[in-house]
Each structure stands twice: as C-alpha cells, then as structure tokens.
Amino acid sequence: MPIEDRDDAHVITHALAKHTLSELRSDETDQVAFRNGLVELGRLCGYEIIDGMMDTEYVSITTPLAETTGEVVKGLDDVVIVNVLRAATPFVEGLVEAFPHARQGVISAGRDEAAGMNEDGEFPITVDYVKLPDIDADDTVIVADPILATGSTMVAVLEEVLEQGTPERLVVLSAVSAPPGLARVNDSIPSADVLTVSVDERLDEDGYIVPGVGDAGDRAFGT
C-alpha cells in the first residue's frame, strides 16, 4: 500500500482507503454504514502501518515437503494501541484486526466546547480517564483518533502516553487531518509519526474540519 510523504504527515494513498473515506464523508451514509466504514478504514490503516513502518526479517521454515525461507514482520507482539474515546472505538476495532496481539489502552479526553477555541486555535482539554499498559523501549505505540482537527486533544493524549514510557516508535493515526492539527502535533511532539488518509483544507470557526466528515463520534454512535 503506497504512502505519500509530506513534511507534516504520511498520507495513505491506497485506493480502497480513499474509497472508504469517500463513503464516510457523504451525509447520506447512515450510522451503521458509518461505523462499519470506520472499522474497515482502521483495518486498512493497520495494514499500511505494517507495510510502510515496520521491518521484516527472513526466517528458516520447514514445510511438510522441504526447507525454505520465509519473511515475517518484526515486532508484531510489541504493539500498543491507544483508543481515544469515543470516536476511535470502531476505528480501533478494525486496527486490532491487523494487530491481533496488540496490548490496548484507553484515554478519555475531549474539548471543552463551552469554552470555545482561543485565538491560537486551541481548545481547553479535559482528560477524564487514562488506562494504559506498560510501554517499553521496543514498542510501537499507535494512538488512534479518526479526526485530527486542532490537535489539542491529541497533544494532551500523547503527553499522557509519554508519561507512561518512551516507545521505539510513536504513531498518530487519523482518517482525516487538518493543517493546524498537524502543525500542533509536530511542534509539540516531534517524535511522533503522523499517518492519515487525508489532509483536508481547513478548520471552521468551531474547530471542525472542512470538508471533513462531520462529528465522527455522533455519526458512528447515532447520537
């Protein structure tokens, strides 16, 4: 699966990922189809991480007929997936299909919508709950949130993750990102690799991505 490298992100260009995201964007996509689409997109993104960001090695294999050499992915047992509640839940469901042996963590964090976005394009963030496994130096940690808008929530989440430990690789995974969010994450946590399916045009005055997909949590959960 191909990846396009930008200065601010790695962008997935695989045709099926783009197709699935296009279905998610449509306001005619109902709640069940939206949720299922996020699951599918999470699975595809997981394969992209394996293909583009993880190393392989050659091993000797004995088949029922002969000795041969196979190629395996290194580090599949050293993956931690962090679910940023709540919109990431179906996204992570698909991601776990690609990483069935991953350890998982959960962080509940969100904007203070009543306070609004300040002049720097940031929201106050409330972190309500953090439950993470141990993070080791040889781990790949994938922090999944389908929407990376202002980056305020993601930076708060990444700071919680790094308090738990410093992994070998820290990946921020989103479906749709906006330039201000990418800039904030890259400036605040330069060790993170951002992987996204689309970098959209801008944020509106309420901090939503345009054209985006709308409120991913509301659309996925029917609220």
UniProtKB/Swiss-Prot annotation:
Question: What job does the chain carry out?
Answer: Catalyzes the conversion of uracil and 5-phospho-alpha-D-ribose 1-diphosphate (PRPP) to UMP and diphosphate.
For molecular function, the Gene Ontology terms on record are: GTP binding; magnesium ion binding; uracil phosphoribosyltransferase activity
This protein's pathway reads: Pyrimidine metabolism; UMP biosynthesis via salvage pathway; UMP from uracil: step 1/1
Q: Which CDD domains match?
A: PRTases_typeI
To which protein family does this belong?
Belongs to the UPRTase family.
Q: What is this protein called?
A: Uracil phosphoribosyltransferase
What InterPro entries is this protein classified in? PRibTrfase_dom, PRTase-like, Upp_A, UPRTase/APRTase, Ura_phspho_trans
Protein species of origin = Natronomonas pharaonis (strain ATCC 35678 / DSM 2160 / CIP 103997 / JCM 8858 / NBRC 14720 / NCIMB 2260 / Gabara)
